[in-house]
């Protein structure tokens, strides 16, 4: 966070460190404080903080592990905190401005999930194919998962620049449904995604397919190498950017992926809206090679699996 004059002159850098400010929630000009969300405690978590304009008195206001969202009172006297983590379904807490609990507004009875053999997701680490970077993935196992047995895998992907999938938050009910059908459900944050700073995020600039395809392949191969994934039964699915991800896996990574469901995909970003695409890819006239490499159409000759494409008549 930086403090500037209205004419753009830098007054002071307020925050620093190897973590990301995710969102500025409010600026209290009278008391010279900034309230913001950040992943300082963990790359997998959004927590609520305050700090003075002078860069001092950085204070964590949400002490519960997990992913938080807050609604700050207009008079800065307190806030409503909504959070969950991998082991705790959504809770809604009323707190004072120091982060002290005033009242539990509502919370979910976890025992209701356990009646359905809820499978608690696990965050894992694996290495990139060049061993340069440790990446994060998240797995939902089938109920009664047994080590030594290989399972079919569904990779749920998105992978667009600056986004993040792997979080410490309550799991998806759709992933639970798939796990209950006997699948391992796997997602990962490839190089070029969010949570690890600008250098990591900018790795995908100019070619959105390069690390997305390589790092997803590395993640799947890791599951195969530790003996839990059936290499003959690997599928992918996703929506929008995830639809693109699925198309890419079934073509560029056709030797790994057998089947996919692609919903509302962008198969060639030259055909998508420029306001989104050009901030990650530059202009088509200046980056033909990057647009060609990013396009799913460049790899259709490799396609050999089964792909279901679902689309409407319009998108953004």
Residue ranges and their predicted role:
Residues 33-37, 79-82:
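Residue position within the beta-strands of beta-propeller blades
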Residues 4-30, 38-41, 51-68, 97-127:
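Multi-bladed beta-propeller domains
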Residues 1-2, 43-49, 87-94:
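Structural motif
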Residues 67-316:
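Serine-hydrolase catalytic core recognition
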């Amino acid at each position: 966070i930086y403090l500037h004059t209205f004419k753009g002159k830098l007054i002071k850098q307020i925050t620093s460190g190897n973590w990301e400010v995710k969102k500025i929630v409010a600026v209290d000009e009278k008391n010279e404080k900034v309230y913001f969300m950040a992943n300082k405690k963990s790359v997998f978590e959004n927590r609520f903080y305050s700090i003075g304009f002078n860069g001092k008195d950085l204070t964590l206001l949400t002490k519960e592990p997990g992913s938080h969202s807050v609604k700050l009172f207009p008079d800065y006297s307190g806030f409503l905190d909504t959070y969950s983590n991998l082991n705790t379904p959504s809770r809604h807490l009323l707190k004072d401005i120091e982060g002290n609990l005033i009242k539990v507004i509502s919370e979910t009875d976890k025992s209701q999930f356990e009646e359905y053999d809820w499978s608690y997701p696990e965050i894992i680490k694996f290495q990139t194919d060049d061993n340069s970077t440790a990446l994060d993935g998240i797995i939902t196992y089938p109920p009664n998962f047994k080590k030594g047995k290989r399972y079919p895998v569904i990779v749920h992907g998105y992978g667009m620049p600056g986004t993040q999938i792997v979080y410490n938050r309550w799991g998806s009910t759709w992933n639970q449904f798939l796990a209950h059908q006997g699948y391992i459900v796997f997602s990962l944050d490839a190089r070029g995604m969010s949570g690890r700073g600008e250098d990591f995020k900018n790795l995908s600039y100019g070619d959105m397919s390069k690390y997305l395809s390589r790092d997803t392949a590395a993640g799947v191969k890791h599951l195969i190498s530790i003996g839990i994934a059936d290499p003959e039964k690997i599928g992918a699915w996703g929506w929008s950017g995830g639809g693109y991800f699925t198309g890419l896996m079934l073509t560029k990574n056709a030797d790994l992926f057998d089947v996919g469901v692609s919903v509302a995909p962008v198969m060639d970003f030259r055909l998508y809206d420029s306001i989104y695409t050009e901030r990650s890819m530059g202009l088509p006239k200046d980056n033909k090679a990057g647009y060609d490499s990013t396009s799913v159409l460049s790899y259709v000759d490799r396609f050999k699996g089964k792909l279901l494409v679902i689309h409407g008549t319009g998108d953004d």
